[in-house]
Amino acid sequence: MKIAVLSRNPRLYSTRRLVEAGIERGHEMVVIDTLRAYMNIASHKPQIHYRGKPLEGFDAVIPRIGASVTFYGCAVLRQFEMMGVFPLNESVAIARSRDKLRSLQLLSRRGIGLPVTGFAHSPDDIPDLIQMVNGAPLVIKVLEGTQGIGVVLCETATAAESVIEAFMGLKQDIMVQEYIKEAGGADIRCFVVGDKVIASMKRQAKPGEFRSNLHRGGSASLIKITPEERMTALRAAKVMGLSVAGVDILRSNHGPLVMEVNSSPGLEGIEVTTSKDVAGMIIGYLEKNSGPHMTRTKGKG
């Protein structure tokens, strides 16, 4: 197969591994800098050009679209879909999962376990918003943040009020969530490919920190997940419409709670921790499932 990898940086671990895994299995792998591709939208034959030439003959496309380029990245991916190229994850699913609020609303509607969550812009009764999520301690998040940036733990209601007021002054939409103390600063990253959790790891925040993101100095270790956690991860990925996803779960006193569903999960942490060939499994999924015009939205955007 001829497989495109949409990635701003061919040297990133995840991009490198996907290219290696594809070549090992005999495929032609082409890395395309998402922002440098440009499109002919309104022609009878949709096209993408890159470095002055049309991109043609691709069987599949692997989107590795960073959060900051979601809008343009999804547009390029959608154009591939219009051309009948099979996407590892569809543009609509990526856009859906990048909107944290929409994700939680969809997961909640399907009855998937979530921390109690409030959402506000300029609340006229801040103490009521704080009570809505069972009071302090609580976590406040800016909607656009990634890798644990824009996430604040407030130990008291007074601190929470100050932080909410500060974000209001910045005209930011904010998410207020109950703090799951029993998780002890740890979460579980379940790596979903197709209808299986192919690998999972526990991420533990460094001492004095509550954010377990590896980018924030958290450490990763092997973990055996429960059948309920496995089911939760698979259902969450399915609700988002993602074929490949990193589902972040907290262990709480009332079962597994989904924190986030990541449409472009990093491979380094999970491969190094579990010694599994995750990149190879992703290519294997494409081998089994890809075909022209096989998107669930049938390439109609």
Swiss-Prot record:
Pfam families: RimK, Rimk_N. Its cofactor is Mg(2+); Mn(2+). It is an enzyme of class 6 (ligase). Its EC number is 6.3.2.-. Mn(2+) 1 binds at residues 248, 260. The keyword Magnesium applies. Keywords: ATP-binding, Ligase, Magnesium, Manganese, Metal-binding, Nucleotide-binding, Protein biosynthesis. Mg(2+) 1 binds at residues 248, 260. Mg(2+) 2 binds at residues 260, 262. InterPro entries: ATP-grasp (IPR011761), ATP-grasp_RimK-type (IPR013651), ATP_grasp_subdomain_1 (IPR013815), RimK (IPR023533), Rimk_N (IPR041107), Rp_bS6_RimK/Lys_biosynth_LsyX (IPR004666). Binds 2 magnesium or manganese ions per subunit. GO terms for biological process: protein modification process; SOS response; translation. GO terms for cellular component: cytoplasm. ATP binds at residues 141, 178-179, 187, 211-213. Belongs to the RimK family. HAMAP family: RimK. This is Probable alpha-L-glutamate ligase. It comes from Pseudomonas syringae pv. syringae (strain B728a).
